[in-house]
Amino acid sequence: MIALRPTPRAATACALALLLLLQAWSLWRAPDAWFPARITVSLDAGGSVALGRHELAAAQADHNHIALRRDGAGAWWLRNLSAAKQVVLHSAAGERRMGSASLAARQAFQIGAARFEVEDADAASVGFARDGHHWRYDGAVLYRDGQAQAPCADARLGARALALWNRALPAILTIGRPLTFGGNVHCANRLGLADVTPGAAWLARIDGRLQLAAGNPDGERAALTLSAHGLDTDLRRQELPLDGVQAIVVGHTRFQLGAADGQLQLLPSRRVTLFSAPGLQLPPSLTWQWQRRALWSGAAATPLWCALALALAALLAATLRPQPPARSWRADALACAAVLLGGVAALALQRAGHAPAAAQSMALAGAALWLWLALPGRLTLAGAAAVLLLAAGLLAQLELGLGGMETSWLRYYQKSAALLAIGAGLGGAWRLCGPRRTGVPSQRGVEAVLAALAALALLALAMQVLWGDETGVFDLQPVELAKLALTALSAHCLALRLGWHGDDHHRDSRAARWLRLIAPALLFLALLGVALVQVDDYSPLILLLVWGTAMAFAYALAARNRALAAALALLVLLAAGAIAGMHGGADPGEAAPAGDFYADRFQAWLAPALHPHTGQQLLLGARAIGDGGWWGADAKLGLAGLGQGAGAALLIPAVQDDFAPAFFLNRHGLVGALLLWALQAAFIVGLLRTALRGHAAGAAARDHRHAWLGRFRYFTLCGGAAFVLGHLLLSWGTNLAILPIMGQPMSFLSAGGSHLLFFLCPLLAFSAASALSLEENPSCRSTSSTKS
């Protein structure tokens, strides 16, 4: 057995064990919580009942959200009573939103006093007429009398470019944009109507069909009527039969439906309100079947516990056996495989609606973190800091999940644990395979891998532009994969650039070579920027600016270009001074023109108290941070509040993502934040230390392949550290009101699943593999006789 010595690995293991014990203590102290596993509605023929947030245990529903009615024949009917929130019906035919309808020829629809006659309609487009004008909409572009409308005056460059794209390309390649009714201006995809609030109704392609739906404008809501076969239907008061409907979604809570013996059964499956005790006053026609929240056992418990037991057994075999000169490879590989399979199983169960218990997720995350410590190689500063940061982030997410009185809060912790296990398993397998490979990978092979990674990232970004929004596509964030590809591709180009010798080529030849080398990175950067502008999210562009500045500074240091380094440092100081000056001396009323989304956000940052609606996030975050003080809301560094309610901090919008630092400061105070800052600084410094070792090894190598590999490691780790530093700066700046709200998660702390799986885990694996290779080959074979 390994003798316990005060080594960095032992100290990290002790700190990790403490953080895992705090997670277990949180689960142990969590009070019992109850929720309705089954809601039964019993109505006589002709009876009806109104249900809402209280009766459905749906926290996001309105007070009176839906009305259920049973007609004389015993059939059940549903009507949406909410003026602002939709109800979605799921059946074998697909998804249908209440308050919407598919248009057909010879129908008519009326918005307020404006009546439109539908001339023709199919899956591709719909044509309608009013007051002698003929309109056609194809899901992307609105045409008036055969001509596309001009862009709106307030349209940004991205919206104008998107409009040109949709007009020029075939329908299959267009990017869907809804048609909105209301307002007094005809432009782009807006159809102006006098005395109708903008956004009173909209027409868009949903599930391959063009559907008309009532909107939720800020002003007065106009009536929306559909006339078909001599009948007029008010879409805002639409009533639909539940025959054939399998599930409904009310206020983000999903209910499986089942009708039998004059009763309607509703089985809530997500975002269900929790109660401290089983017992609630309900209408006579409503009964609940109570169920206790299970934190220690869940769906498919036995197979998942078996996988975790296998992983833990392999980890024990890898760490507690006598230490031989060459470590055993099989036990480590078995541990990686078991952790990977456990993560895949946990993620699949969660996606299927049967999430594992919190204790299973805790054990899975613990196995993944111990795997990083058990794998061969010296534990670096970056690796130790990353393990502790991941454990601290999981503890904060578990506190968030246990502190919220809603079943959905735990899903962030469960998803992060599953993705961490997947990333640790894949990264560990790569680390194990690295020492078994001999030699340096060929440049062509590396370029092929980088090209494939860039193509995959571009494809994912295109999917986000076509089918997603600023939050991602298919519950993933392609931007995270794009950042990884951009970092690796740029590192390769810069590594090749440093390999040139000043007396090898003429000036023109060197300029041409530079252009050819950097062109792929510039092209990818341009495409990434265009894609981000199209999905209406500018904060990643600011993150790219931070990354680009850091990469240029790293190149200046490597090339010993002191003038460039000094210019970049001066630029950073000027930017910091400009931000401080704007925040301290700008007039909130004149800082930016009103009416633009980012202008409103900028004004809310300068004076959130003057904008109580748009500045609510900043105000709630500041209040939570103030309540935390130095030692946390419980005055005991958050230890007394483990497993207990989270209070008003849960009211902060996006508290699990953008404002996770505000929640952490509320729970653990400024002292806890200082410890977190120290770990974050240690991680950045650790990455840079490994990067400098790689650069030194490349500079000492006499073989051009080893020299390129050292420089590639240097720029890749510098780029990764720059992105992480950018995330930390933007997140802390947002939460502390130093910067406007940027919408970027904090690395390791926020519940950013894609950021963890697609960026952090590959970066950690590359850093560990680089450190291991540099440890085994400290000179990078500098005695080789091959000339560069």
Please state what every model-predicted region is.
Residues 2-38, 241-468, 524-527, 675, ...:
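A structural signal for hydrophobic alpha-helical transmembrane segments in multi-pass membrane proteins
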Residues 38-40, 564-676, 709-712:
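Hydrophobic, glycine- and aromatic-enriched re-entrant/interface helices and adjoining loop segments
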Residues 44-115, 119-122, 136-137, 141-235, ...:
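Forkhead-associated
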Residues 244, 251, 306-317, 670-726:
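Hydrophobic transmembrane alpha-helices and their immediate junctions
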Residues 327-330, 377-384, 440-446, 511-519, ...:
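Membrane-interfacial entry segments at the cytosolic side of transmembrane helices
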Residues 407-409, 465-490, 508-517, 538-540, ...:
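Membrane-interface segments at transmembrane-helix junctions in multi-pass inner-membrane proteins
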Residues 520-534, 538-590:
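Hydrophobic alpha-helical segments of polytopic membrane proteins
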